[in-house]
UniProtKB/Swiss-Prot annotation:
MF terms in GO: ATP binding; protein kinase activity; protein serine kinase activity; protein serine/threonine kinase activity
SUPFAM superfamilies: Protein kinase-like (PK-like) (SSF56112)
Biased composition (Acidic residues): 66-94
Gene Ontology terms: cellular component: cytoplasm
Protein name (record): Probable serine/threonine-protein kinase DDB_G0290621
Classification via Pfam families: Pkinase (PF00069)
Gene Ontology biological-process entries: signal transduction
Statement: the UniProt record of this protein carries the keyword tRNA processing: no
Every Protein kinase domain range: 345-610
Catalysed reactions, semicolon-separated: L-seryl-[protein] + ATP = O-phospho-L-seryl-[protein] + ADP + H(+); L-threonyl-[protein] + ATP = O-phospho-L-threonyl-[protein] + ADP + H(+)
Biased composition (Low complexity): 297-326, 639-666, 863-882
Organism in which the protein naturally occurs: Dictyostelium discoideum
Length: 967
């Protein structure tokens, strides 16, 4: 990095004044070096802090001013020296010799000045000619620049000089004519309404040379953009338009710059309607009002042939509704030579390589270059096929094309920062670090994106991918979005008869190809359809669920024999996978293509897998059994049924059997397909928690001064009835899911409406806020839970997720007064702990960041209340005033030996540790009952700790979480 680059990096972003001041400080030589060293690297640096491409206009003015000042100083010094010499000569020579000497010196000085100015002009012209073609600013040409161009061209017309093509130092000329069409076209991947600056500058040149003003040109452009009725509106991109090279040889600088122009053209490309309508008008305007210089006979013949080809292709495109760009793929002029691109195509920029192409990262794009060593005919067909298909596609899970070059066979694609799915283990960690298999939940989440992309290809565009495999799917490391790539051998469904030849049957990877592609029989040609991708999808799903290459160490013939004999499961076992996934993969592997499901059916099956409880081996269960609230009717039906559901709860419950019998007949219009939301409103999620998570199930008596009481006894009774109804609904849902969908939906809507305005007790609110903090939904502006956060909650908190992790917690949840959050390790508690649960309620937390600390949110009876309970068996034990709530931190010294430590006490079981801490609890209770505050201070390290998460950021510091004794 030179000194100039260091100075550029120091400047702040958008600080144009500082940049101009920096250039002014440079000497003339430094400025000249600046112009000589401006390449992609310095342009990148300048673009970073100015957020715009490099502009040489104002730099050229600085160089010109400084060079004039330096030359003036040198000339003044020479004049002074000459004057001194002349004075000395005047003493000796006579008047005649003096006059002769002065005239000669003046002539020399004038000639020297003229030569110096001519050299300066030549140098400036060389610099302008060399870099003017390189710079493509992202903003349109300003009025002052347009006036300068018009003035220059008017002077040339007055002198009757033809417009000379732009030349660089290598002698390559660039013609501004629109008669030749090249491969640099405007893709329809973006919908920008601006033309590229090269198009505007070329149109200005043609208009100004023909005598048109800038206003008339702009009006013609606007009028032409509206007259697009006669232009084909095919899904392909607009017609190509660029400046073509007049010779096949050019400098490496120009070749690199051509690729840079290809990349920059993406930000200023036109829409389909505007570009397609503007192109014929510009060509017509150029032909009518700007006649080219008289060409030679060879040029006339070439132009006539090219015009005939263009006319024939335009007629064919109008008849077949195909864009002219598709027909002109093989007839483009030389844009990028075949050699001298070592700066781009080197190993340091390579990010991927396949059998037929290599991918390089260059200027923020992915440059796909087909290998020149392969057969040109096959590669050209694959190249044209991929370009033709990519320009028709527009889906968030399919890679987007920027532009391409037919001569170099280069395709510029959007860059995706991530790896392919064949490197899946490095991107997705399993649920347990000791497990050798991935988390099926994560795999299914990712594969839903692939299914959406394939539904778009099959049903909306009509394309068969033919090469669906993990290496052709990229995963963005930033947003986890999947992108489908590599459409070189893809086919259109309506051209099966033309494309399904013997060569196409052998295409694709044999590990993922179906049997009908591996058998070269003419009878199988009719069987090649969309089911080819379904078979590959099943193999790919198995690979990502097992992290194992299918048919590893087997040859093509062996794999072919296995697939034709239908012995796949002997090599690709499925028994260890959840049953729903087993059935789906077996359907995708059917030998008969007509039996294989479509991707729409696959999507519905994946949704059912998500909504059902799917146990796997080793006690691991994934996803959520209680996520049935995601299955709902349309929003309009939900809104219309809200009021009815509130008033007709009993009626709906009594008519459950009738609804179950009439699901398929009477209620077809009310049921809809399964809907998986991208985000869940917090209100629905809170209702879901209250209905399905049994948090502290001991009921509280009415007490107006306690934060635990509900509004009244009736609301408490309704809550109990509602909870019992929810339990019955869950059992019905788990046992009769397919028969009770409508009943569950109605009851779930009832629960949402009944609980929407309900006041939860303090423990409910505490757990809600704790979960809300974990899900990072604290901000009031962000009142939704995303799917990723929802899955994180289920992975960390749901008792249905873990292996031995939640076995003991599942037992605890059946005991009133206990609910546990156990995140990382296994806790096995003794039977004495269960006995202790009848008197003490617990909320168990394990810190996700520190698994060696266990937090117990305890609710223990006070000493006075315990004496009353021993004497009288009444309902006073439910009075919150007789209980005290506190939190203790327990240190887990050794999980294997079950060593629990707290406040200097150690035990091999958690129940034993609590028994040892019971005297401290009793002393604290008695101190609180007497109103003493000394016990709080003495036990500050043991009780009343603001954890977990500092009591949810001290949100309810006034005691709304706990009873009045807690402060």
């Amino acid at each position: 990095m030179n000194s100039f680059e260091k100075k550029i990096l120091i400047l702040k972003k958008d600080d144009k004044d500082s940049f101009i001041a920096l250039v002014k400080q440079l000497s003339t030589k430094e400025k000249q070096i600046l112009f000589d060293t401006i390449d992609s690297r310095i342009r990148k640096l300048q673009t970073i802090y100015l957020n715009k491409p490099f502009n040489l206009k104002f730099l050229q003015t600085f160089i010109k001013e400084d060079s004039d000042e330096d030359d003036d100083d040198e000339e003044d010094e020479e004049d002074e020296e000459d004057s001194d010499e002349e004075e000395d000569d005047d003493v000796v020579e006579d008047d005649n010799t003096k006059d002769i000497g002065k005239s000669r010196d003046s002539d020399k000085s004038i000639k020297g000045k003229e030569k110096g100015k001519e050299k300066e002009k030549e140098e400036i012209e060389i610099i302008e000619q060399r870099y003017e073609t390189k710079v493509i600013p992202k903003k349109p040409i300003y009025k002052d620049q347009q006036q300068e161009l018009l003035q220059q061209l008017q002077l040339q017309q007055l002198q009757q000089k033809p417009i000379s093509p732009i030349k660089d130092n290598s002698g390559v000329s660039y013609n501004t004519s629109f008669s030749s069409l090249s491969s640099l076209s405007m893709s329809n991947s973006t919908s920008s309404s601006l033309l590229s600056t090269s198009l505007l500058s070329a149109s200005l040149l043609s208009a100004s040379s023909s005598g048109l003003s800038t206003s008339s040109l702009s009006s013609s452009i606007n009028n032409s953009s509206n007259n697009n009725s006669n232009i084909s509106s095919s899904p392909l991109s607009s017609s190509p338009l660029t400046l073509s090279s007049s010779s096949s040889s050019s400098s490496p600088l120009q070749r690199i710059q051509s690729i840079q122009n290809l990349i920059r053209s993406n930000s200023l490309r036109t829409s389909l309607s505007s570009s397609s309508s503007l192109l014929p008008n510009l060509i017509q305007l150029q032909q009518q009002q700007l006649p080219p210089p008289p060409p030679s006979q060879q040029q006339q013949q070439q132009q006539q042939q090219q015009q005939q080809q263009n006319n024939s292709m335009l007629q064919q495109s109008n008849n077949n509704n195909i864009s002219p760009r598709t027909q002109l793929l093989n007839n483009t002029t030389t844009l990028l030579p075949n050699n001298g691109l070592e700066e781009i195509f080197n190993d340091s920029n390579k990010i991927g390589e396949g059998g037929q192409c290599s991918i390089y990262k260059y200027m923020g794009t992915a440059m796909k270059r087909f290998k020149p060593s392969l057969s040109s005919s096959l590669i050209s067909k694959e190249f044209e096929n991929e370009v033709l298909i990519l320009e028709r596609l527009n889906h968030p899970n399919i890679v987007k094309i920027i532009t391409y070059s037919t001569i170099e066979r280069i395709i510029l694609l959007e860059f995706i920062d991530g790896n392919s799915l064949d490197k899946y283990p490095s991107q997705s960690l399993p649920l347990s670090p000791s497990s050798s298999l991935p988390n099926p939940l994560k795999v299914i989440q990712d594969f839903q994106q692939i299914v959406d992309a394939m539904i778009y290809l099959h049903n909306e565009i009509g394309i068969i991918h033919f090469d669906l495999k993990p290496s052709n799917i990229l995963k963005n490391s930033k947003n986890n979005k999947l992108k489908l790539i590599d459409f070189g051998i893809s086919k259109f469904l309506n051209n099966n008869n033309q494309n399904n030849n013997n060569n196409s049957l052998n295409m694709g990877s044999y590990r993922y190809s179906p049997p009908e592609l591996l058998c070269n029989n003419n009878q199988n040609n009719n069987l090649i359809n969309k089911s080819v991708d379904v078979f590959s999808f099943g193999i790919m799903l198995w690979e990502c669920l097992n992290w194992t290459l299918p048919y590893e160490s087997l040859s093509r013939e062996q794999v072919k024999q296995i697939k034709t004999d239908m012995e796949r499961e002997s090599h690709l076992p499925l028994d260890h996978l959840p049953k729903g996934i087993q059935d789906l993969i077996r359907l995708c592997w059917k030998h008969d293509p007509s039996i294989r499901p479509s991707f729409i059916e696959i999507r519905s099956r994946l949704s059912e897998i998500i909504l059902n409880n799917i146990p796997s081996l080793n006690g691991r269960q994934f996803w959520i059994s209680s996520s049935k609230y995601l299955q709902q009717n349309d929003d309009s039906l939900i809104n219309n049924n809200n009021n009815n559901n509130q008033n007709n709860n009993n009626q709906n419950n009594n008519n459950n059997n009738n609804n179950n019998n009439n699901n398929n007949n009477n209620n077809k219009d009310e049921t809809t397909s399964i809907i998986i939301y991208e985000s869940i409103p917090w209100l629905k999620f809170k209702t879901f928690l209250s209905n399905h998570l049994n948090i502290y199930r001991q009921s509280s008596t009415s007490n107006s001064n306690s934060s635990f009481n509900l509004n009244n006894n009736s609301s408490r009774n309704n809550q109990r009835q509602q909870q019992q109804q929810n339990n019955r609904n869950r059992s019905v849902y788990n046992n009769n899911y397919n028969n009770n969908n409508n009943n569950i939906i109605n009851n779930n809507n009832n629960n949402i409406n009944n609980n929407r305005n309900r006041n939860y007790n303090a423990y409910y609110e505490y757990i809600f806020d704790y979960i809300r903090y974990i899900l990072k939904v604290i901000d009031e502006k962000r009142d939704e839970v995303s799917v990723i956060e929802f899955s994180r909650f289920c992975t960390f908190f749901s008792p249905l997720i873990s292996s031995s992790l939640f076995r003991s917690i599942q037992i605890f949840c059946d005991i009133p007064g206990l609910y546990g959050y156990c995140l990382k390790k296994d806790l096995i508690l003794s039977s004495s702990m269960i006995t202790l649960m009848s008197k003490i309620g617990y909320l168990i937390f394990i810190d996700p960041n520190n698994i060696n600390q266990l937090f117990l949110k305890m609710k223990a009876p006070t000493s006075s209340s315990s004496n009353k309970n021993n004497n009288n068996n009444n309902n006073d034990n439910n009075n919150p005033s007789n209980f005290i709530d506190f939190t203790i931190r327990v240190k887990i010294g050794n999980y294997n030996q079950r060593i629990f430590q707290c406040h200097g006490h150690t035990s091999s079981s958690l129940s034993g540790l609590i028994k040892e801490l019971q005297p401290l609890i009793d002393n604290n209770n008695s101190g609180n009952s007497s109103g003493s505050s000394s016990s709080k201070k003495s036990n500050s390290g043991f009780l009343y700790q603001k954890t977990p998460i500092s009591e949810i950021k001290d949100r309810h510091i006034n005691g709304s979480y706990l009873n009045q004794n807690y402060k």
